[in-house]
Every structure is written in C-alpha cells, then in structure tokens.
UniProtKB/Swiss-Prot annotation:
The UniProt record lists the keyword DNA damage: yes
A single GO molecular function term of this UniProt record: serine-type endopeptidase activity
Name listed for the protein in its UniProt record: LexA repressor
Biological function: Represses a number of genes involved in the response to DNA damage (SOS response), including recA and lexA. In the presence of single-stranded DNA, RecA interacts with LexA causing an autocatalytic cleavage which disrupts the DNA-binding part of LexA, leading to derepression of the SOS regulon and eventually DNA repair.
Amino acid sequence: MLTRKQHELLMFIHERIKETGVSPSFDEMKEALDLASKSGIHRLITALEERGFIRRLAHRARALEVVKLPQQATAAAPPKGRGAFRPQVFEGGGAPPPAASPAAAANDSRELPILGRIAAGTPIDAIQHERERLPVPEAMLGAGEHYVLEVQGDSMIEAGILDGDYVIIKKGDTATSGEIVVALVGEEATLKRLRKKGGSIALEAANPKYETRIFGPDQVEVQGKLVGLIRRYH
C-alpha cells in the first residue's frame, strides 16, 4: 500500500509522461508535491522503485518509467483504447514494438515525416524539408497532425531527451506553460520547455549548462509540442 505522497508522486509522473512523453524533472516533482527539498523526492522515488511501481531508465539522466499503477487507479482511469498503461517512450532498433500479428502491426502504427534536426542546445536553422518517414505507434499519437524531428544536442537530457533521439511533435501554434515545444525564434528552431512569465516567454533547458532565454511574446512562434520520443540503437 502506498502512502498519500507516494501515490501523488506516482500519478504525477504517470500523467506527465502521458502528456509530454517524458518524465518530469526533480524540480517539477518537488514543486508539484509542495516539498521543501529534492531529498524528499529521492526518498519517494526509491520507495516507489522498491515496490515495483517505477524503474529508472539506464543511461538517461533522471528518466523514469511507470511499470504499474495502484489497482484502484488503473481501474478508475484506464488509458484510452488500452487495457494497461504503456509508456510513451519506445526504445529499440528504430521500429515500434512488435504487435500480435502483421495485420495488427499495420493498424497500430503510422508513418510520420522526419522533417530534419532540432536543436536541444543552441538554436539551429529552422526545419523545412522532409528527409524520410518513420513508423510511430498509434499509442503515442492522438488526433491532429504530427511530425518527427531528430534531436541534436544535450540541453534536454534531464528531461530524458538525448542527442540522436527522435521526438514526436504534435503540430500546433499554442502550448501550455510547462510543456516542451518546438519554438521558432527568428529563423532558428529549438526544443525547450516553455514558461509564460508575465508578458514574457522563457525557453528553459533541462541541463544546468544552458541558461534560460527570455523573449517577448511576439518573438517566439510555437511550431508544435512534444508528445513522445523514439530511440534507435545502431
């Protein structure tokens, strides 16, 4: 049985992964649970890990995966179209996990265009051209138009986004404060967490090596928001 704080943290991680495709940072978890320090988050994560509810992903800074939810939580709010929770991050040789049959596989994935590279670091030239297409599990997608970008740089590593990852982006020009977005600044595109601060827009990295950049609201154009990622092993 989980304590109230353990349950709150587990559900926060679960919901954040569903919304953005990546686990929240320790700072975000601390803020969400209204704790005074990260040490409390460390203790809660260790307790959840020992009880088999979450696991840490190897070779990914502070990245977590929800393995299971408490019985009452899964019964009350099962993911749409699925009998059990499935993480939004798929890792493997470049293809989605195998389905039960070839027919099922054809129905459960969608070919999305890879439009180029996106900077997780210093902004690079805006993405313009389709390079190839990538099969993406339908479980990662919802309604709307989506596309894929290859990550270049290390500024989002504490959000579990590594150099060479393929991020799945839902096309759109709006985002909620705290979401990870593709932001166009002038003629350059970057992948960052967007924060709305008064009349300004902050683009935050998830790596202490990089500074938060502040812009006026008319200087940042949202091109879409992160819904998941795929990792290829070569």
